[in-house]
């Protein structure tokens, strides 16, 4: 199968997030999040950084997405990783995460972090992420989740 990775816009990934990754989500889906790795919230993220969005296409249809943005000068967050079940196991998540790692390094970050959902462990481990602490549900609409980091 032919897959094409593209840098896209928020409006391209939003329908996938709304309908497939976070169906029925109560909180608004924004291009970025104010969450930080130390489990705090920093509203200045919205003013200081720009988000990046990627999609993997197959036959001109989006089959996988991810996004990322800085949360401070040296840390970059991966957010919204999703691969269509019919296309899982083909390395698409790893492709997206590797592209995100390249982007994070290009903007001067040395650490990428994320809060993956249970069931997606393999994708993150295959891209070099390690898990921090244990699984939790508190504060998450779609848990359980775990903090995870990858050092660049």
Task: Set out the residue ranges of the language-model regions.
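Conserved active-site tyrosine of GNAT-family acetyltransferases
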Residues: 17, 124-125, 129
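Conserved GNAT acetyl-CoA-binding A-motif
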Residues: 104-117
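Active-site rim helix/loop that mediates acceptor-substrate recognition in acyltransferases
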Residues: 17-53, 57-58
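Conserved beta-strand in the GNAT
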Residues: 55, 61-69, 77-82
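Conserved catalytic-core motifs of GNAT/GCN5-like acyltransferases
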Residues: 113-115, 130-150
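A conserved beta-turn-beta hairpin within the catalytic core of GNAT-like acetyltransferases
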Residues: 70-81, 88, 140-141
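Conserved N-terminal entry element of GNAT/NAT acetyltransferase domains
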Residues: 1-11, 152
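Conserved acetyl-CoA-binding loop-helix of GNAT-fold acetyltransferases
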Residues: 83, 89-102
């Amino acid at each position: 199968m032919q897959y094409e990775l593209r840098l896209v816009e928020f409006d391209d990934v939003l329908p996938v997030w709304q309908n497939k990754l976070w169906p029925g989500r109560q909180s608004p889906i924004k291009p970025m999040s104010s969450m930080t790795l130390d489990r705090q919230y920093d509203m200045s993220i919205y003013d200081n950084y720009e988000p990046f969005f990627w999609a993997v296409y197959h036959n001109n249809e989006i089959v996988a997405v991810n996004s990322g943005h800085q949360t401070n000068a040296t840390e970059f967050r991966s957010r919204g990783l999703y691969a269509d079940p019919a296309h899982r196991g083909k390395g698409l998540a790893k492709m997206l995460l590797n592209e995100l790692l390249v982007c994070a390094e290009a903007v001067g970050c040395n650490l990428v972090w994320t809060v993956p959902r249970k069931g997606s462990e393999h994708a993150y481990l295959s891209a070099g992420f390690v898990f921090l602490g244990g699984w939790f549900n508190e504060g998450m609409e779609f848990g359980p989740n775990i903090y995870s980091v990858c050092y660049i």
